[in-house]
């Protein structure tokens, strides 16, 4: 569905809190689009606790978007200089978080961030943005006007039902664009009927750390999501 909509180029991937698997989901979405021959870039905007470079086994932690956001404005050559190849598919590039700044909140409201995302949309079919958990910091809400769609990641047997109240509130108030929910880490042995896909950790040597994500059922007295 995403690959067929040329107007929805910028996609935020977020969650309520840490540990729900948003970076895994973002990386799998980016890789899936790349395999469909879509020129894709994944952007690491969880700049307080970045995991993207580790996930793709990128040893260079000096390049990244924080170098761009250190300035108020930017151009394509400056953005391009911070982009690295993913090493797993020729259609997938990465703009990792880069060095951790002392003022992450300030960087998220700079004009250079808006310019960076706009430039990436000009040069790529899809821009997948891995953000900070929206329930912990307000950074992600600053991106609402820069993206076209939001994938909100929850984790089975981990995320609470109150997360859905929060997501509904964000949707009603138009805090994030076009929210869709992804349920991550489903145990298929516990559910007779499941709609799921595999995902894994990407590296130059192949995939590992496999799990599942898909639809959910919340018919339970427990506060966590039961699948």
PLM features per residue range, with description:
Residues 1-227:
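P-loop NTP-binding module
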């Amino acid at each position: 569905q995403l690959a067929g909509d040329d107007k929805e180029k910028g996609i935020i991937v977020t969650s309520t809190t840490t540990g729900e698997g948003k970076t895994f989901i973002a990386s799998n979405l980016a890789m899936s689009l790349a395999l469909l021959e879509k020129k894709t870039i994944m952007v690491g905007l969880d700049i307080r606790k970045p995991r993207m470079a580790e996930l793709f086994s990128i040893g260079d932690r000096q390049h990244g978007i924080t170098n761009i956001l250190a300035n108020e404005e930017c151009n394509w050559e400056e953005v391009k200089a911070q982009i690295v190849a993913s090493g797993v598919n020729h259609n997938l590039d990465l703009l990792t978080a880069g060095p951790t700044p002392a003022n992450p909140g300030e960087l998220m409201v700079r004009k250079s961030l808006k310019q960076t995302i706009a430039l990436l949309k000009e040069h790529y079919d899809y821009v997948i943005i891995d953000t900070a958990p929206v329930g912990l910091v307000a950074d992600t809400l600053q991106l609402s006007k820069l993206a076209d769609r939001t994938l909100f990641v929850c984790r089975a047997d981990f995320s609470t039902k109150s997360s859905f109240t929060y997501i509904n509130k964000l949707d009603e108030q138009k805090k994030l664009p076009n929210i869709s929910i992804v349920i991550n880490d489903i145990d298929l042995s516990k559910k007779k009927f499941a709609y799921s896909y595999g995902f894994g950790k990407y590296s130059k040597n192949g995939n590992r750390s496999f799990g599942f994500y898909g639809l959910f059922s919340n018919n339970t007295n427990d506060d966590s999501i039961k699948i």
